[in-house]
């Protein structure tokens, strides 16, 4: 039984069931990101090399996020690290980005969007401390 939120992504009529990250999966994801960045060269890179590294890191981060999410399914026996290579091979960049965004939203990893209406209401509200 899982208490995690879930949602479905429907690329080309297929259903991909994505889950909120558990506390354990979130820790695994953070550890993965830290280790990925430790191995990066820091000096003497050209702008093109920096762009390539940033692109590769983004895709790897997104793939791990999706893999960890998929590993949360009750019927999934593999860990996220085992699913990761499959995600890297089978997901095109656009689908990978969409899936990763959905996982971030399910997991509360995306800051809430403040609409213009909400900002106006907050500005117009009386300041109780000044009263």
Segments and roles (model prediction):
Residues 4-13:
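Short acidic-hydrophobic surface loop/beta-edge motif
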